[in-house]
């Protein structure tokens, strides 16, 4: 449920009422059995509205008869009735299914106003409101403190007035103070009872703990779902082999990211329900396909293959400095030990080596070499080499962090002592973590071997061709295409683009407008700076003419046949009216700069720690002008708590200074020198859905 800005409800005006408890997930007053309340900034499209509560959908469910309702609205309705609210066909709640991930994403992107409007004027996406209330909103923070003080004083008064202990929460109930927290919102000051915890955990549609906001010191001490700095294999099951995994991905060897990185994990998806993968995790292998250094679209095709069981080899980069680790003895084969001396042009030059640790063998190992880097040019090092020592410092039981510190502190000469096994040891390269298989047969994936990094300039991977088309049609005939995007759209600042061209339509007969084309102009009217609703209105108005002139940009991704024919994943032929189609992340990267939409993100910190993100790119990494990409967001840092930066975002300026042509070794010190505040100008493109 919710309201638009014209009928906005301020929580300060109603919070004194004792009838409805205050929910700290939405910041409004409602009972836990009711939907969250939101103050929406704009009118919401009818297709995204529940026809029971007449508000934007929350936890949407699809009925077999083709209608969509809020989870709680439909559940409450079917407790008394046995038919669909719209067409009155017989309906059972168990036959309803969760709506597609795309619908969830559209709903999550709806803009809402902070309910504490007297002290906070922020506008954000609906999915970001809970994190805003937990970590950034002064009004919510003051309200939590006031409720906690009221609870403490009331509890003390009850204890003083009673000889024996007072049971505040009888079986099956919650005290008014506990109930005012609302379903699914757990402030730092309180803990859920076991009864309420089970109810909260089983409620469909709530955030998966795997990507829950960290709200206090205790949360960072909880065990991680995957080990950090280690290559791990997990097993994912899905009952329907054709259902999407529920993640968006960025990366690929067209970019400095090289590997495939998870940008977002969508609630209610297969990956979210599994609960182990997070945004920022790298996917190195899918079943028998090594995707550690392949094109973005090849990796997307591999991840989109229909199968009931996926074995994903993943890497979660280390996020915390001092993490205990166990060393185990390993029966390694005969090793070749040799010395490698690398000479840097200056002390700030990067070696271009990616170091990791393994779970069953101590020490530091080379995961990857960046093309154009010093180590790759030298040619003597390779992936899977073990680093025994650097400049005389013993690393037989060392960590990648220690190795990085030694390299950073060294001068222009770095001496490496390397051990190379006589033959590969598959058992030493992959760890099976938390296998969810119910089968007694243990799956052992093939060994992971990293390919040399070889990304190239994006201009070689994506081509854009402008085309001018004039179509003649009947006055009342529609153009016959569906579009998405628009400035301020739910998926981000995107241009208007074609999502499908239905058969038998005017444009389908003409054949020149294709799915994925970016629309620039119609009948002389510019579309590039319009919102989605404005662009749709303009297209409909122009379609009334007997002749329609379109200017569009055809974006094509150039694929190289780098994989053998037998390695190619099986793909299904796609037609121009495929309802499940969504654009590729690489498609956005190739757009001309005139279609880019930059926005500023201001990060603040009260201590001289990390800003909380890692970057790749810059001139030094491959001797071309590659942009800077965000690769990792670190838990418990300013970037993480702010919530706006995502993996795959491009940093185009820092404090107004352009990063074009800047080297990696120049940008990193600049970011570190900023003390309490930094302004990042970024371009954010949505990752590819899989």
Swiss-Prot record:
SUPFAM superfamilies according to UniProt: PDZ domain-like (SSF50156), RING/U-box (SSF57850)
Motif NPXY motif location, chain numbering: 208-211
Zinc finger (RING-type): 50-88
Alphabetized InterPro entries for the sequence: PDZ, PDZ_scaffold, PDZ_sf, Znf_RING, Znf_RING/FYVE/PHD, Znf_RING_CS
Recorded superkingdom: Eukaryota
BP GO annotations: neural precursor cell proliferation; neuron differentiation
Keyword Methyltransferase annotated: no
Free-text note regarding domains: The NPXY motif is required for the interaction with the PID domain of NUMB. It is however not sufficient.
Binding partners and assembly: Interacts with the phosphotyrosine interaction domain of NUMB.
Protein name: Ligand of Numb protein X 2
